[in-house]
Each structure stands twice: as structure tokens, then as C-alpha cells.
Amino acid sequence: MNTDPDIADAFKKMDLTGARRHVFLCVGPNCCATEAGLATWDVLKARLKEMNLPALRTKAACFRICRGGPWLVVYPEAVWYGGVTPERCERIVREHIVGGRPVEEWIAQTHPLL
């Protein structure tokens, strides 16, 4: 196990013990304009922080779909959403991440890993 104190501090700040979901967002440039992806990222980041939600977030450059983005994936359910605008992101945060109910009309795929 790594004993570097800076790495240990980084993990402590992430508070992995409290996380209930991990949200990944592809911000382009192949599936969408980078500006569109980053606008959605800004909303996701702000809402999770404002609401103090027990969720991790990760910004990604490519999910290898390369069309129909920005793409957002919510784990542990492994629900894939395509075309996630800032407005759609708001609803996904409210209904899926907070309420536990995936937004059915925007689901492109589900693929639980376990």
C-alpha cells in the first residue's frame, strides 16, 4: 500500500467512505463540442457541491462512443445517459442521484459491472 502522506491526504479529502455514487462525464471533443461538455460539467460539479451529495465525480475525455454526447454514467447502477445538456444534468442530479430514480427517457444503456 502506498504510504505517501500527500496521496493519503488526497484520498481523505475525497471522503470515499461516504460516497454512494460515482458519476463520470465525458466532455468531448469527439462526442460533443468541448464547450458543451464543460458547461454540463460545471452544472454537475456545482449541484453535487451545493447539495453536499455523497457522490464522487470524474471528468473524462472519451468514453469511445464519439457521438451523441456529452455522456454521463452513474455508478453503481451503470446507467448511461447521452446528450446531457446542463438542463438535463439538473434533472438527472435531482431524480437519479438524489432520488434514486433513473431518468428513463434519456437512458441509452445500462450495464451493471457486478
Where are these regions (language model features)?
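Conserved helix-turn-beta segment immediately C-terminal to the redox Cys motif
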Residues: 41-55
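Local cysteine-cluster metal-coordination motifs and their immediate loop/turn environment
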Residues: 20-35, 58-77
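Iron-sulfur (Fe-S) cluster-binding modules
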Residues: 1-25, 29-31, 49-52, 78, ...
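Conserved strand-to-helix beginnings and helix N-cap segments that scaffold or border functional pockets
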Residues: 37-38, 86
